[in-house]
Amino acid sequence: MNKKSLWKLILILAIPCIIGFMPAPAGLSELAWVLFGIYLAAIVGLVIKPFPEPVVLLIAVAASMVVVGNLSGGEFKTTAVLSGYSSGTTWLVFSAFTLSAAFVTTGLGKRIAYLLIGKIGSTTLGLGYVTVFLDLVLAPATPSNTARAGGIVLPIINSVAVALGSEPEKSPRRVGHYLMMSIYMVTKTTSYMFFTAMAGNILALKMINDILHLQISWGGWALAAGLPGIIMLLVTPLVIYTMYPPEIKKVDNKTIAKAGLAELGPMKIREKMLLGVFVLALLGWIFSKSLGVDESTVAIVVMATMLLL
């Protein structure tokens, strides 16, 4: 551990300690007040990152278990801290995060992008629809729209814009402005189309269960959001193209796609395996009721399989 990480760790540890020595506000128990301090420290830890995010969260969980065991007076068991992990929804999102990381690590996300550019990216309007199809393909397995748009889609589309002579400070209206607007608006749409497309959907599903007492499956969510989502995805690039027309109309997409695919090389065995797992995961989530298998079971199988790649 270097000195910088050590100071970050000291700051994180100081937060719950300081809050713990302060009197609890009216209406809050001492336990709730200390847990708030741990929660706040975890958020700060995720921002300043003295360690990778999983390590920060594991430390927060461990600290919470120690506090609950000593301050609850027997009202709560330490296992209550882990109760959220018994939810099938949680494991569904975990598995989707695993898949999203695999898309980045294996390069399959990039390969899909360049294939789409080669097929339908001969015009700037076509490039707008490349962002649609790419985001739509990745959305079911990427429960972070920031990771999806910023980690996979944006770097590729940005490199295309730069290759076409469009840079943020010099010539954004050449093509870059249109493409960036397309990415932003498209990812907002795909985020609500699938339950596993955005982490915030977990909260929405819980509110639906609590208020309306409805149990919505992965397939049910996708079916309900599918029609409005598809309409929005078909219209969005065209509307942006009309409102912010790019200066470039034609694109040498074949050259861009060929160069990108050449850099990636032939499709590797890990990419093929990931593609197979991804398709099977989607089929499992969509037809879980017909197959008599719980969605969380499919999620855990997916996670276990991903560890083998």
Regions found by a protein language model. Name each.
Residues 1-22, 145-149, 164-269, 273:
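Juxtamembrane and boundary regions of transmembrane helices in multi-pass small-molecule transporters
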Residues 10-18, 40-43, 62, 94, ...:
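Generic alpha-helical transmembrane segments of integral inner-membrane proteins
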Residues 24, 55, 59-167:
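Membrane-embedded alpha-helical segments and adjacent helix-loop junctions characteristic
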Residues 24-29, 72-84, 209-218, 289-291:
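Membrane-interface helix termini and inter-helical loops of multi-pass transporters
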Residues 25-30, 40-59, 81, 238-242, ...:
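Flexible hinge motifs at transmembrane-helix junctions and intramembrane kinks/re-entrant loops
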Residues 30-34, 86-90, 116-133, 168-181, ...:
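Membrane-interfacial loop-to-helix junctions in multi-pass transporters
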Residues 33, 81-91, 221-231, 295-298:
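Loop-to-transmembrane alpha-helix initiation sites
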Residues 44-52, 134-144, 184-195, 284-290, ...:
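Transmembrane alpha-helix interface/packing and boundary motifs in multi-pass membrane proteins
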